[in-house]
Swiss-Prot record:
InterPro entries: Ankyrin_rpt (IPR002110), Ankyrin_rpt-contain_sf (IPR036770), DUF2314 (IPR018756). SUPFAM superfamilies: Ankyrin repeat. The keyword Repeat applies. ANK repeats lie at residues 196-225, 229-252. Keywords: ANK repeat, Repeat. Pfam families: Ank_2, DUF2314. This is Putative ankyrin repeat protein NMA1343. Gene3D superfamilies: Ankyrin repeat-containing domain.
Length: 253
């Protein structure tokens, strides 16, 4: 479906789309939190999940830029890793199906679909808002998704019915008791570091899981632990915009 999708070229002066890109960057944390929990599900819940990012190269007449979709996403708090889903229109320095890495600040959109309902898709809705009803129908048919009201962008599952889902993922609330029991039986894993120096506390902070972070701290996780590039869990919480997590990790005087 997505591999054959049209790449949309948008002029830099298109203010609605540019504003949409800014909103996507500010809310990317919700996208990554959902993917973080998707990896813990026995049965996947997402139809797909992708990020749109800016790719560019120097051309004869100046810089060539294209916004294209990436899937198979991993995020380390600074960079997004994935596989390019689109076939570039003009760029020759990257190919469809190639593994790519982009700074999180270079994204222009994110979207995941759960039970046929799209979340994110800020630039998509901005462009749909400039279409006629007939054009929107054709656009949605090409995607195979009903994007609904172009003025509405959902961030998290059932956010209208359960606004608390913006603060904490429902899976986090549901499994925190079991997680605490695991910590009581094996707190040593909190001090394990991967090849890049990340501890479990780093990963939970990046994903915005405040309940998990709180439990880890209570069982001895070291908030001063740094990655190989010198980042603490607090650094990542601040970068992502998880204030509730940052408050837990702030040094106590």
């Amino acid at each position: 479906m997505m591999g054959d999708s049209v790449i949309y070229y948008v002029e830099q002066a298109d203010k609605p789309v540019n504003r949409a890109g800014e909103r996507a960057r500010k809310t990317f944390k919700y996208f990554w939190r959902e993917l973080f929990w998707e990896r813990r599900r026995i049965i996947p819940a997402l139809d797909f999940a992708m990020v749109k990012a800016l790719f560019f190269q120097d051309g004869e007449d100046g810089e060539i830029c294209e916004h294209m979709w990436i899937d198979d996403i991993y995020f380390d708090g600074l960079y997004i890793y994935g596989v390019l889903n689109n076939e570039p229109g003009e760029l020759t320095n990257v190919e469809q199906g190639e593994s790519v890495c982009v700074p999180v600040d270079d994204i222009s959109d994110w979207m995941f679909v759960c039970n046929g309902i799209p979340y994110g898709g800020f630039t998509i809705q901005a462009m749909r808002g400039q279409m006629t009803e007939e054009e929107r129908t054709e656009h949605d048919a090409a995607w195979g998704i009903d994007f609904g009201d172009p003025g509405q962008v959902l961030l998290v599952y059932e956010e209208k019915e359960h606004p608390e889902n913006l603060e904490e993922h429902p899976m986090c609330r549901n499994c925190i008791d079991d997680f605490r029991q695991q910590l009581s039986q094996n707190p040593d894993f909190l001090h394990e570091q991967d090849e890049d120096g990340y501890t479990p506390l780093h990963h939970e902070a990046i994903a915005g899981n405040a309940l998990m972070v709180q439990a880890m701290l209570e069982y001895g996780a070291n908030p001063a632990s740094k990655t190989s590039e010198g980042y603490t869990a607090l650094d990542f919480a601040r970068l992502a915009g998880w204030q509730n997590v940052a408050d837990l990790l702030e040094p106590r005087h």
